[in-house]
Amino acid sequence: MKKAYETAMINHGGRNGEVEAPNGSMHMKITPPGIHAEGTNPEQLFAAGYASCFNGAVQHMIKTAESTVKARVSLYNLDDGGYQIGVVLEVHIDGISEEEAQKIAEDAHEFCPYSKATRGNIDVEVTIV
């Protein structure tokens, strides 16, 4: 396997802190989920990354049509006191049938690096909207 790209982010303070790119291109305040404070949280950042990556995979499959992907990331309480995330990817592709869109979404799910990374680790549902 040949590395195509690498990036890094640095966090200070965990879920009540900040995250920044070492090159200074990004800096954000981090807050726990459900807190109505200025900032974002790890679940929102994961949703942003997954939606962008998955839509990139969809675009790779369709080439010409417009598409949108909404990633809904949920945080679940586990019986052991821990947490688990789950994802629903809502895919819309302009100008094609639901059956065609479903096939493209399935192919994108096999191609997307986020889907590959999460496969077998968390529940991911792909739906056509």
Briefly describe each language-model feature range.
Residues 1-48, 55-129:
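Extended beta-strand/beta-hairpin segments
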